[in-house]
Amino acid sequence: MAQKLDDSTRDEHLAPLMRAGWEMVEGRDAIKKTFVFGDFTEAFAFMTGTALWAEKWDHHPEWSNVYKTVEVTLTTHDVGGLSELDIKLASKMDNLA
């Protein structure tokens, strides 16, 4: 089972994601990012690729898609905040984008 990020490693894990455009969600222990692609097909391909990893890791994003834009929020509901699963999925999403 995932564990909530502890204070000693939290900044270390989040810093690279913040530099890559992820932001903290106000009022929640969660991160968010907006991905913009060339068109709907590219956005949907990104979501499909992400979905395969999310299923493999049993960790699913909160997300929405409008045309070429995908808005993503990551948190681990089971632990009530951010976990290493969120860091792992955010990094994978950046690589897929």
UniProtKB/Swiss-Prot annotation:
Q: Name one GO biological process term.
A: tetrahydrobiopterin biosynthetic process
Gene3D superfamilies under this entry? Answer: Transcriptional coactivator/pterin dehydratase
Q: Does the keyword Lyase apply?
A: yes
Record keywords, A-Z: Lyase
Xref: SUPFAM superfamilies? PCD-like
Q: What class of enzyme is it?
A: lyase
Q: Which Pfam families match?
A: Pterin_4a
Q: Which reaction does it catalyse?
A: (4aS,6R)-4a-hydroxy-L-erythro-5,6,7,8-tetrahydrobiopterin = (6R)-L-erythro-6,7-dihydrobiopterin + H2O
Q: What InterPro entries is this protein classified in?
A: PCD_sf, Pterin_deHydtase
A GO molecular-function annotation: 4-alpha-hydroxytetrahydrobiopterin dehydratase activity
* Enzyme Commission no: 4.2.1.96
The UniProt similarity line reads: Belongs to the pterin-4-alpha-carbinolamine dehydratase family.
> What is this protein called in UniProt?
Putative pterin-4-alpha-carbinolamine dehydratase
- Species per Swiss-Prot/TrEMBL record: Dinoroseobacter shibae (strain DSM 16493 / NCIMB 14021 / DFL 12)
Organism lineage string:
Bacteria, Pseudomonadati, Pseudomonadota, Alphaproteobacteria, Rhodobacterales
